[in-house]
Amino acid sequence: MDTASTLVVIGAGHAGVELALAARQQGWAGPILLLGDEAHEPYHRPPLSKAFLAGAAAAATLGLRERAAYEKAGITLRLGARVAQIDRAAHVVTLEGGVTMHYTKLALCTGGRPRLLDVPGMEAGQPANLHYLRTQNDSLAIAASVRPGTHVVVIGGGYVGLEVAASSRKLGADVTVLEMQPRVLARVTGDAMSAFYQGVHEGAGVCVRTGVAVTGLERDGAGGKVIAVRVKNAQGEHERLPADAVVVGVGMLPNIELAEAAGLAVDRGIIVDEHAATSDPDIVAAGDCTVHDSVLYGRRIRLESVPNALEQARAAAGWLCGKPKPNQSVPWFWSDQYELTLQMAGLSEGHDQCVIRGSVQARSFCAFYLKGGVLIAVDAVNAPMDFMQAKRALPEHLALDAAALADTLIPLKSLLAPPAAAALA
């Protein structure tokens, strides 16, 4: 490959770091510039709501790579570099402050940002004790607000909200979770798993309120701290919930503004194909900022997960280096709450049957999601071996018998064998 060709990677999260390193490994011979908009060296984000927030992991353990790894790979890492504009015609990236960089190929790994709370009480700006969680600094700010006896109100009962709730309980805080939907984790899992996790949190002393709409914040004077969250409950009654700290986890917005301003095709994310290529032949994109057409599910999807970021980054690197290998990986996710590990593969949306295998009481089980008898997704709690078998089986579109699937006396491996393998057995 031409040693004069320059690859510029915008975004130094999981996708950006993986893409830069993979491009070098797959033969990119020219300069590689990795631009991160934070002052911190690239770091793992999942622990921010878990071990790092709970004080069980130090900042020094968060790094995605040692600094020497970038130097060894000949990657120039530039921190605190925020991109203002992309000129596709000139192949130039302009940073805030006016510095310009020429690229031969460009990778957009811009990630996402928290969806902001928009209710009365926010007009004077973000209160000092109201937090979002996306960065290391965000996690540090939350940890500083959470102490034994403080009352923490978590707005949002998704992954982030429940993980923050679990970590806050470990730190001794009194925690209330407010979820607008009728159940927690409503966007990502089925009724049974939602009920299980609500029970887990309530058993740990968390007050979980579902079907609740936040109607406003009460502040200590104009521009002061939040002292209460006002809500409308499922019965239509208005309530005032005192709060020492508020953490908002109501979703994420993809950072697509640079791509959109540059004229790239977008649709709730930067549109990429199975090689992570965009509508511009000289630009790829990977991670939370993208959408792609899923072969497995037959629709356009946007995934917010580290595994997807890594798989897309590797596909992008291969494409850039003339070694295309399409990304056809199964979507999967994980969440650590208390002593439980939830692993999820596939997308359960649209399922018409949920089969439980294992012991809910013993907190080691799987929820298999079927649509028309065909396996489309699985959630596993403290059942890693069953999870891996099911994850591998998802691309096979297996038709499964629900009764057999629920019967733990029947080996799962025999049920999930592809038809050809089953015939040989």
For the regions a protein language model found, what residue spans apply to each?
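Mid-to-C-terminal Rossmann-like scaffold of FAD/NAD(P)H-dependent oxidoreductases
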Residues: 2-6, 12, 25, 289-388
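Beta1-alpha1 glycine-rich phosphate/pyrophosphate-binding loop at the start
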Residues: 2-76, 167-188, 389
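Residue-level detector of alpha-helix initiation sites
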Residues: 14, 39, 112-114, 137, ...
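FAD-site-proximal beta/loop scaffold in flavoenzymes
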Residues: 125-149, 221, 225-228, 240-315
